[in-house]
Structures are given as C-alpha cells and as structure tokens.
Design a protein with these regions (language model features):
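Nucleotide-activated sugar donor-binding and catalytic core shared by glycosyltransferases
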Residues: 1-208
Length: 208
C-alpha cells in the first residue's frame, strides 16, 4: 500500500537528505505529497534536517520553471507537485510513473525503492531487465541512477544525487527522448507510456 511505502522509504530518504545537507548546507528540501498520506508524511518528516517544505495536493495556478526560486512554496506550501518538480535542482523519487512526471519537468532524478524481503526475492527471480525506471526503459538508456531493494541505502543514493547537482545536464537527452516518444501520435498518454515501456522491455531482452 502507499502507506507501507511511506513507512519503508521515508527513513531511507531521511538518511539521504541528512547526508546531502551536510555536504550542501544551503539545500532546501521539498516533499510533495498526496491527500491519502499527507498527514503521515507531515508527521514523519517533522524532525528531518533542513525543515522540509511540504507541498500538499492543492493545485497551484502558476507555472514554474527552474529559473524561479522556492520562495512561493515556502510561503504557501499549497502548490502542486508539478510546480515543485519544475523548481527543483534534483529529485529523489520512488520508482514508478513519477519518473515520467520528473522528465516532463526536466528535473534530474535519482530513483530509489525498497520492498519487503519476500517481495525482493520473488521480483529478483522474475525480473528480466536491468532497470525498472520508466525513463531508462522508454529512452533505451541507463542514465537515471536507481537503487532498488538491498541497494536502497543512503550511502549509495547520496553520491548519485551529488553527481547530478554537479552535472544537471547529464539526463537531459534521455528525458527529451522520453517525452518525444510519449508525445507522438494521437494515442492517449497512458497507452503511449505502456507501449513505449513494452518496446523498451523488448529491446532490453533482445526481442524485436
């Protein structure tokens, strides 16, 4: 469930944030959330270093870009996640469709996800590809770092985040390619995403 994901991932993300802030003291942390887990997220991150800005599910009317500051988010905390994505220099996100949303906002990202031990064992035996990140699959690249299962640890995540802060253009081409593929034709976006992902899976397995 989404609540169990929050319980499992946020302590790991907290460790990553704490280490990152030690290296980048001026960093401001923004945590977008949805209504189903907003209360849980607010409680969990209340003692995080850097006093994270919680972005609730209420929609913002403004359109944001990377050139703008986080001042409005600090003042209101009611902007939607798209505004937070667009204003961010780098994102740490769970695996899933959020990587496509970040790519649409041109936000460099690191993907991290953990699961219960039994789920790890089952999935590791079934997985036929070397990446689960949609941007990697759709763009047929491996430029988005991912830390899954036993690798979902702050000491592994933080160097990848620091590398992106130093070189934010590293994923630009892959994100552009992903959006180009998902934007082609008149098919509904969800179907295009599924088709592009299946195509990427086939390419990764040498099928065609």
């Amino acid at each position: 469930s989404r609540r169990s994901e929050v319980r499992r991932l946020l302590p790991i993300f907290r460790g990553a944030v704490a280490a990152l802030i030690r290296q980048h003291p001026a960093l401001r942390v923004v945590v977008p959330t949805v209504s189903a887990v907003e209360s849980q997220v607010r409680t969990t991150v209340a003692d995080w270093p850097g006093k994270p800005i919680i972005v609730g599910p209420k929609a913002a009317t403004a359109t944001w870009t990377h050139t703008q500051t986080l001042a409005h988010l600090v003042e209101t905390a009611h902007s939607d996640k798209r505004a937070a994505f667009a204003a961010a220099d780098v994102a740490l996100a769970a695996s899933g469709t959020v990587s496509l949303e970040l790519a649409a906002a041109a936000t460099p990202m690191v993907i991290a996800y953990d699961m219960a031990w039994l789920s790890r064992q089952i999935i590791s035996r079934m997985l036929r590809v070397d990446t689960v990140t949609l941007v990697n699959l759709v763009s047929e690249t491996r430029v988005v770092p991912e830390f899954i299962g036993a690798n979902c640890r702050p000491d592994k995540i933080v160097p990848a985040l620091c590398a992106l802060l130093s070189n934010p253009e590293a994923q630009h081409s892959a994100m552009q390619r992903t959006m180009a593929k998902l934007g082609q034709g008149g098919t509904k976006p969800g179907i295009r995403a599924a088709q592009a992902t299946l195509s990427g899976l086939g390419a990764s397995n040498g099928e065609g």
